């Protein structure tokens, strides 16, 4: 009921309540039948019977069931709302309906009853209150027999809602062998009421109803008389014997001739003698004057008009649901594309920044003597090692660039992979790095070191040996813990001397969306071998030593080593001793 706004009560009875509600999204007015929560199974049985029928059968002259739901253990049936009934018409027209209107209504009611009977369905509660009438004059049969109409405050409820007035004699006597004729009897009683404005067999009890049936319609049949005499309810009761005219027009003088014939055919005491619904549709009352041929196009036009009105309401309700479904389909579709072709396109876009980054790292690694074709070949080996890091299984011929783009959210993984892989050959002989802040990183690197690339060519092996020779120039850079301060100072030296390399690395940082501070945390293990600028491609090992000596002389490279610490301690001791000697030699000032 969260989607509906309650506007008021339509009816209330022993089985449930009928509420007039408004859909909050579409504004459509509906009637919701709410069944009471009862421990007995009769309520659920009645509700499930109605739900099963309404879901199975659809007709222009039957009320439409919109939806069914259960809330707080109560069954809710949502119907289209038509607030006008034949009973309302009779209250407005006290002397009965006009003949043309009456014939149109009866024809539509018979169409609904014939549809039910053709499907072996018995309504069992046909009465003016259960015949809905739309504004365009379309009648629809409904089943609100479980609820009774609400009277004004202070008014007394009548027995009309019990529908006793329209019960066939076999139902009154509780005969178990009743069928479709009970609806025909109720139709005959309703026709008289619609034509005259007064109920034909109003009664206060079953015995009163039987007495009036005998007086106005006819005596009981032998079968029904036998049931009556054996019934303990009617024990000791004697019904009168009345002689009735056989002519229908004399029997029902207030009715039109043809209409009296229909009523007479409907109100037969023996159920086997009653007319069928299909025969009633072909009665002269409906076939004369070409009524059916004229009224059917009019009826279809009205039904089409109402369908258009309903179509203006229902798409509003279904449009939001359809939009949600379309969004879900789009989401599923885009996810599918991302997992297949779109992912490949995005990865191809990321190829260039990754290649640039690899080249810059090679410059940092001191591979200045490697030509460009060799770099491309080495990138193939690097991609194979990166593929070993990835979870996705790759074939030996697949390059890393086609696996996944760099992750800007977690740059440490990509940085470590790209920074360490160029030195994987030399790091095979490197002693374990014991860094307090990067144990996890060192462990990840070692896991990759013991899986060398199969695609490493002889040229890559030569570069590996050259990298080992370069690494042997400064053995302290591999064996000593550089520490975070040394890594920062090494960064400063590198930034001062390699302006062009900084520009390229800054471009790569923007593309990969990580800051310089993030790189400081992860790249310090190989900083000692990255102090060589890109412009020193043809330099020899001696020139590298000269650069490193000059870097030690600069103010920015005040990196304490073990030797420097010992020398500083000796200097401090010497200066301290000299000061004490001077103080001793100074004369005392009085």
From Swiss-Prot:
Domain of life, per lineage: Eukaryota
For binding ATP, which residues are annotated in this chain's numbering? Answer: 10-18, 33
Listed under catalytic activity are: L-seryl-[protein] + ATP = O-phospho-L-seryl-[protein] + ADP + H(+); L-threonyl-[protein] + ATP = O-phospho-L-threonyl-[protein] + ADP + H(+)
The question of whether RNA-binding is a record keyword is answered with no
Catalytic residues at 125 (proton acceptor)
Q: Which GO terms describe its cellular component?
A: cytoplasm; nucleus
Query: Where does this protein have compositionally biased stretches of type Basic and acidic residues?
Result: 547-556, 580-590
Q: Name one GO molecular function term.
A: ATP binding
- The Polar residues compositionally biased stretches are 466-477
Q: Give the Phosphothreonine positions (modified residues).
A: 158
What stretch of residues is annotated with the motif [NKR]KIAxRE? 45-51
Which UniProt key words apply to this protein? ATP-binding, Cytoplasm, Kinase, Nucleotide-binding, Phosphoprotein, Serine/threonine-protein kinase, Transferase
One biological process GO term for this chain?
Answer: dendrite extension
Provide the protein name.
Cyclin-dependent kinase-like 3
The gene is CDKL3
